């Protein structure tokens, strides 16, 4: 396995066609429509056809195909964050920058600035916006949390984490990744890279006072390892304001590191010792060989209803992992509270697939399948049925999506 591909996969949760694909003369069967602001934003990676990505506004999800006419080119494996009508493209493991776009009334996006996050490596781990004048972004290799003004995209401060108090096993490089703000405490997932993307054992999370921007303490739980994911971040809260921390277990390459979800209950600042949703140390019905190697991306739809992609090692090709062409990933529906789950009746997709979101009764999955096409497939929560072809077709792999 090539280390470059493995590191880029960290964006997946860690650039089919030539540049002319974004020209208005392409073969999109439906022209862009003028129906107001885009109601969906897609982040698409174009590998293996090209080493680039696109941020694509979609005005009308009833159109059968995604038009790239108004797309903005970015680096490979892009991810998204939003605030009001601002859309941010996060570089993940391919680009040190965060790019800002504004959603326009005519369905387009206007680029409105950028900021370099990590000044030591082409990486921007995750970001979140607090308000019009304050946002955070993580620089995993520089070991800093960058504070910036999201209106002007200017750096206003930083939190230096290069300290053995926040590292593991004597290291002073905690490698901050995911961010989540709850009750004025900034929760920061720490990669604790040993030899990236292999991490030191345990799920390490740093708590920061969001008023003073001073670290409060570091917590660790050794039941799972590698807290939060480059690009995706993936922490979320439920209706109880309980915080869930995803752990990807060094992709399953370290035997005693496991993948799944841990919890910090509402009003608490330590891991819940009574909760651990271990996704890799179990046997799954409907999965070839019964085992998953890791999970990177999750989507919480409410009332304990959780969706995710699971990587199955049974479908790795003879020449080793090919995260773009091997169809290794199953789509799952799970019960967050009972720690149970089932495989959904979708065709399998590639290892880069990360995009899951929902609108009302429809759950959208970005899939790149062997024989059923590529694009957005839908699970109907009312009828419990899965589409067997994309409701919206696109080129490339959808890495992330926002639905308005």
Predicted regions and their residues:
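Short glycine/acidic-enriched loop and turn motifs that connect beta-strands
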Residues: 46-50, 93-96, 141-144, 193-197, ...
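Post-signal peptide N-terminal segment of secreted/secretory-pathway proteins
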Residues: 54-150
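Repeated scaffold domains used in trafficking and secretory/extracellular systems
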Residues: 73-84, 119-130, 168-178, 226-235, ...
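Acidic, serine/threonine- and glycine-rich low-complexity intrinsically disordered segments
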Residues: 173, 177-313
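Beta-propeller fold detector
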Residues: 64-74, 108-119, 155-168, 215-223, ...
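Loop/turn-rich, solvent-exposed surfaces of beta-rich toroidal or solenoidal domains
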Residues: 291-368
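Bacterial Sec-dependent N-terminal signal peptides
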Residues: 1-42
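Beta-propeller blade signature
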Residues: 57-58, 149, 200-213, 257-269, ...
């Amino acid at each position: 396995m090539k280390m470059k591909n493995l590191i880029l996969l960290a964006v997946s949760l860690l650039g089919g066609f030539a540049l002319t694909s974004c020209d208005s003369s392409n073969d999109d069967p439906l022209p862009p429509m003028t129906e107001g602001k885009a109601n969906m934003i897609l982040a698409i990676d174009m590998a293996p056809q090209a080493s680039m990505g696109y941020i694509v506004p979609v005005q009308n999800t009833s159109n059968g195909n995604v038009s790239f006419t108004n797309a903005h080119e970015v680096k490979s494996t892009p991810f998204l964050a939003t605030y009001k009508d601002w859309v941010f493209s996060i570089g993940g493991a391919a680009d040190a920058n965060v790019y800002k776009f504004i959603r326009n009334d005519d369905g387009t996006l206007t680029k409105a600035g950028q900021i370099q996050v990590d000044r030591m490596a082409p990486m921007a781990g995750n970001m979140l916006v607090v308000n019009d004048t304050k946002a955070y972004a993580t620089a995993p290799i520089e070991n800093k949390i960058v504070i910036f003004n999201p209106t002007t995209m200017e750096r206003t401060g930083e939190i230096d984490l290069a300290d053995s108090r926040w590292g593991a096993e004597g290291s002073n490089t905690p490698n901050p990744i995911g961010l989540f703000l709850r009750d004025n405490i900034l929760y920061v997932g720490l990669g604790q890279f040993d030899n990236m993307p292999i991490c030191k054992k345990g799920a390490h999370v740093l708590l920061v006072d969001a008023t003073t921007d001073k670290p409060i303490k570091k917590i660790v739980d050794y039941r799972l390892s590698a807290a939060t994911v480059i690009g995706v971040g993936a922490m979320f809260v439920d209706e109880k304001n309980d915080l869930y921390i995803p752990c990807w277990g060094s992709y399953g390459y370290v035997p005693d590191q496991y993948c799944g979800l841990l919890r910090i209950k509402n009003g608490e600042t330590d891991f819940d010792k009574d909760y651990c949703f271990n996704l890799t140390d179990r046997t799954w019905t409907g999965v070839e060989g019964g085992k998953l190697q890791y999970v990177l991306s999750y989507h919480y739809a409410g009332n304990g209803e959780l969706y995710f992609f699971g990587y199955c090692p049974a479908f790795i090709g003879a020449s080793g992992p090919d995260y773009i062409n091997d169809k290794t990933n199953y789509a799952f529906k799970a019960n967050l509270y009972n720690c149970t789950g089932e495989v959904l009746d979708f065709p399998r997709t590639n290892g880069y697939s990360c995009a899951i979101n929902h609108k009302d009764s429809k759950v959208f999955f970005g899939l790149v399948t062997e024989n059923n096409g590529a694009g957005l497939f839908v699970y109907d929560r009312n009828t419990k049925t899965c589409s067997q072809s994309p409701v919206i077709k696109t080129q490339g792999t959808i890495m992330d999506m926002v639905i308005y």
